[in-house]
Amino acid sequence: MSPLETNPLSPETAMREPAETSTTEEQASTPHAADEKKILSDLSAPSSTTATPADKEHRPKSSSSNNAVSVNEVDALIAHLPEDERQVLKTQLEEIKVNISFFGLWRYATKMDILIMVISTICAIAAGAALPLFTAPSTFQRIMLYQISYDEFYDELTKNVLYFVYLGIGEFVTVYVSTVGFIYTGEHATQKIREYYLESILRQNIGYFDKLGAGEVTTRITADTNLIQDGISEKVGLTLTALATFVTAFIIAYVKYWKLALICSSTIVALVLTMGGGSQFIIKYSKKSLDSYGAGGTVAEEVISSIRNATAFGTQDKLAKQYEVHLDEAEKWGTKNQIVMGFMIGAMFGLMYSNYGLGFWMGSRFLVDGAVDVGDILTVLMAILIGSFSLGNVSPNAQAFTNAVAAAAKIFGTIDRQSPLDPYSNEGKTLDHFEGHIELRNVKHIYPSRPEVTVMEDVSLSMPAGKTTALVGPSGSGKSTVVGLVERFYMPVRGTVLLDGHDIKDLNLRWLRQQISLVSQEPVLFGTTIYKNIRHGLIGTKYENESEDKVRELIENAAKMANAHDFITALPEGYETNVGQRGFLLSGGQKQRIAIARAVVSDPKILLLDEATSALDTKSEGVVQAALERAAEGRTTIVIAHRLSTIKTAHNIVVLVNGKIAEQGTHDELVDRGGAYRKLVEAQRINEQKEADALEDADAEDLTNADIAKIKTASSASSDLDGKPTTIDRTGTHKSVSSAILSKRPPETTPKYSLWTLLKFVASFNRPEIPYMLIGLVFSVLAGGGQPTQAVLYAKAISTLSLPESQYSKLRHDADFWSLMFFVVGIIQFITQSTNGAAFAVCSERLIRRARSTAFRTILRQDIAFFDKEENSTGALTSFLSTETKHLSGVSGVTLGTILMTSTTLGAAIIIALAIGWKLALVCISVVPVLLACGFYRFYMLAQFQSRSKLAYEGSANFACEATSSIRTVASLTRERDVWEIYHAQLDAQGRTSLISVLRSSLLYASSQALVFFCVALGFWYGGTLLGHHEYDIFRFFVCFSEILFGAQSAGTVFSFAPDMGKAKNAAAEFRRLFDRKPQIDNWSEEGEKLETVEGEIEFRNVHFRYPTRPEQPVLRGLDLTVKPGQYVALVGPSGCGKSTTIALLERFYDAIAGSILVDGKDISKLNINSYRSFLSLVSQEPTLYQGTIKENILLGIVEDDVPEEFLIKACKDANIYDFIMSLPEGFNTVVGSKGGMLSGGQKQRVAIARALLRDPKILLLDEATSALDSESEKVVQAALDAAARGRTTIAVAHRLSTIQKADVIYVFDQGKIVESGTHSELVQKKGRYYELVNLQSLGKGH
């Protein structure tokens, strides 16, 4: 049964009142874990969105990118509303807080899973218990003392050897079963969590998404579920095995001889105390280090998210210095942390060697007193050695468990949330027959994500069945809100929405949405074929289960109706063409027509068209418009339109202004009334006669997709679910200028680097630390000698204890000496381990700091096109700075030191063994490669498991993210079940393939564990034979045996660094790639002519431009424009027509594709970039302030640090903010908070203007500098801008025309060209495009 048919709310959660919601992380169990969680969540949080060129032109209605707001904040924001309205908003936002125990992670385990886990647990414990049973060497002593004959000895020996072989076989079986079992149940449980999570996400109301941000869902479904899987898979088995080893070893020791075991346990207490004390410091220091990195990360995030600002002002160096302050701080704490770690490891080795000394010394006393025999002493010592080693294997896994619990708390919180608008619910009635009459009664609406804005106030509106109602009005007047309320995406805070007189609240939500088809302004297609995309329109309708032929007929008819059939059949694969993720392989007009076909295919009763033709050019719009009019016949249709010509035939036209109805009637009635609507019509009518189709426009459809595929570099290659890349090759009839040039550009390639290149590259970061490196490496060699020395001492001690009773006085003397030697080795180990730890600590922390600071500076060096790419989003780059640099230290000194240490151990062990007894040494050496291979395979497999499961889930995660990021489309198509079933099928397929690889790789892992026993058996058998023939004494036997086996095992641990080294290699390649990338427009470049002065004459000559990330969309099409020195020039036009692009090209954020831009007659691409930009100042729509004081923020306007006070004051006075600053208690030293959050919009904007004026620019660029302000602040800021423009060449982009009436020249843009120019009064008299814009705006003001 799929989770869809069950309710994930268990009775006890359903009974509970939804808890007050907050997003604190109480679940993270230790302060350290909590801290890491915080950093992780900070990294994964979707970064604050800055306007990329793409969304500058289309800003979504609600872009609150902050993650789930806590309840107290929500309460504060809605406090001004009446109680019932508050309740409506709260239910749409409410979150549940869940507390989870570790066992709660198996919430969805089936009976089968539990059975497998029980078996795996038993096996894991058995596998752990086998290791200490290793300890049975008493036979040797009896033969040394000639107590038994050779034959008797040989029988005993064979028994012992067989005992090891059986243990090995047992180990193989138990390890195999427990590894496979835990990995399988871990994957299975996580798969269920993923399915329930997606199901729950698809259930949630749209308001919840507005607040959540798609990034959050992506993080949960990818990173967080991986953390859970990590915490409940093989690590559970490894931990149980280690604990079992520890317990068994100590039981054996105490059973054999409790007094000696008790004395040896005392050092374990010392060890625990040392570790505990040390870890307190480690937690403290790493918290401080993480805090500093966090603060640095915030700076990096602020700077990268406002990169245009930093680039325009040339303040990269200043900002990089601010970042480096935090890095230095982090380095200081990080170094302390690593040094403490080094001392802890040193203390651990020191105590362990002292423990051997103590054990032998006490053992010799007990032996002489006759209290115990030699065999028991050896057993106790071996057992304690093995037991204390295994305890070290538990701690690394503990972190994985706490992370898993913390990650699950958030995910289960969403799963348990009951959506107020649940599309899965069967509640509510369905109507057998309805006409389609829609009515809004006294509706008041507020978006949950923006509770401070009332979008609609007391609107009553009747939309008769079978008739077309059109909504017009300025943006933000509430047109799209009507659509959102009819679709029930939101609940109105007051009033009702009725369908045929039934309150839609009482109707079943899924049924309601199935009766309605929606075509929105920016149509969303899914990453599948055109056929399947149109077929999505049939989900839940009476045609859903028709025969395939009938469905195909319906789909083709719908495509013909939407004027899409012809272009679809012209594609090589026709209807089976894959459209790519979100349909990016098609042009805007093609996507729009497929969306229309999808909407009409099910013959819906109600059709909602939200600016359905806005993405089309004039030619295709006419055809589609005719199609829509045909489609609207006989249905209730609601049309939102900007172009009034498209709604002339509507039965009723409703003019909305500021959330209220201004006037309504038919086209003729409204024109006769002579109100606002008539002015609009006149303005538009005049224009439509004047408009001539632009060259690029007429053939926008024919811009070949082959060209697009060429420009789109590998970065956006979309692939189908089975992994085949999808592109459309189609030859076009005619290319525009810019696409012709773009198609000649070579595609970007990704360089590959050899391991040696990367090692040299990483080493270059550590060049100044070479003395520390040398100290570290020398002490690593010394530390590596500890193990071989210990083996000699061990063998000496054993042969001493084997002396017969007659030599007890010699025994006591020798035992004292060798015990003392153990103690000395312990002290030496403490010194060498601590010293190399400290030396490498300095190296690796400095490496991380240098890498971060260099990377940050290199990122700031890049051109703006680099930041427009999706893979270089603010979040991605900040996380690259924090995680990849950490990985880089995987090939720094510490790892090299460890490798050197273990190589020394192995080398010394082999030499000593060969010197003392070459026969046995050679036999033992023959198994070393096998042991090493086992060690290597073990870690290779673990690394494979992890990377495999990450990769496997990327495909399905992408699918889930595509669905959640276009949740409105999924909801309006009622595709929730369909999406869930595809996701479920993908996870199932992954589960099957991963099971096969788990079965294979666990086989290797289990073999590697069992081989250790077989190798021991071989050495034991051959050594025993030599002993029996009295060729070797017990000393030679034990030296060779323990040197090589222990040496090889410790050498095997080198491979535990393999995953780190793998990550480090990838990280180094990423860094190298970044450092090798030379931006086209290079901020560091000294080339080009440096300017002494600038007059300020500007000219654009036939400039063509497309954004590198959207090469299919021409933005400027042959722009010609001149500005005289000192002129105030305004650029106006509808959104997306290229105004802001003109400013970006002037700042040289991008280079034009064709044509040239001249300042004072010089081509700006030939000038020195920094010299040129120093004469410009930019004030943009969203003022950018950084953490710090007002003064620091203003000083960012210039490169120099020391500015005379009077310049600063003059800039502030000109910006109309000086008085305000002086009124603050701290004056210029007032802290502005993150992103300037402590100041209002108007205050921030004026600080930004002061910063721009401090440069004393010759050219001032204003990009909608007042559009984000309310009318009060707008006046003040506008006055400041007018003052600032005196005596300078000023170019202003404006949405509010009232702000530019005084301009010397106004250029009117449309579709990337200038259609009119002149002064305000000239243009108004022309009654052209400008006149229409003026009327549109006065409509908004007049009511």
From Swiss-Prot:
Pfam family, one: ABC_membrane
Activity regulation info: Fenamirol efflux transporter activity is inhibited by the cyclosporin derivative PSC 833, nigericin, reserpine and valinomycin. The effect of reserpine is transiant, while that of the cyclosporin derivative PSC 833, nigericin and valinomycin is proportional to the time of exposure. Cyclohexinmide has inhibitory effect only when applied prior to addition of the fungicide.
GO MF, one example: ATPase-coupled transmembrane transporter activity
Location relative to the cell: Cell membrane
Transmembrane segments: 114-134, 163-183, 235-255, 263-283, 339-359, 366-386, 773-793, 820-840, 887-907, 920-942, 1010-1030, 1037-1057
SUPFAM superfamilies: ABC transporter transmembrane region, P-loop containing nucleoside triphosphate hydrolases
InterPro entries in the record: AAA+_ATPase, ABC1_TM_dom, ABC1_TM_sf, ABC_transporter-like_ATP-bd, ABC_transporter-like_CS, P-loop_NTPase, Type_1_exporter
UniProt KW Glycoprotein keyword: yes
Reported induction: Expression is strongly increased in the presence of cycloheximide, camptothecin, imazalil, itraconazole, hygromycin and 4-nitroquinoline oxide (4-NQO).
Segments for region (Disordered): 1-67
Gene disruption phenotype: Leads to the cellular accumulation of fenarimol. Leads to increased susceptibility to cycloheximide, the cyclosporin derivative PSC 833, nigericin and valinomycin.
Broad class of the protein's primary localization: membrane
Ranges of biased composition (kind: Polar residues): 1-10
Annotated ranges, domain ABC transporter: 438-683, 1098-1336
Keywords for this protein: ATP-binding, Cell membrane, Glycoprotein, Membrane, Nucleotide-binding, Repeat, Transmembrane, Transmembrane helix, Transport
Residues annotated as domain ABC transmembrane type-1: 115-403, 774-1063
Membrane topology: Multi-pass membrane protein
Glycosylation sites: 99, 309, 545, 872, 1083
GO biological process terms, semicolon-separated: transmembrane transport
Gene Ontology CC: membrane; plasma membrane
Ligand binding (ATP): 473-480, 1133-1140
Function: Pleiotropic ABC efflux transporter involved in the protection of the cells against a wide range of toxic compounds. Confers resistance to the azole fenarimol via efflux transport. May also be involved in the secretion of penicillin.
PANTHER family, sorted: ATP-DEPENDENT PERMEASE MDL1, MITOCHONDRIAL, ATP-DEPENDENT TRANSLOCASE ABCB1-LIKE
Family: Belongs to the ABC transporter superfamily. ABCB family. Multidrug resistance exporter (TC 3.A.1.201) subfamily.
Identification of the protein by name: ABC multidrug transporter atrD
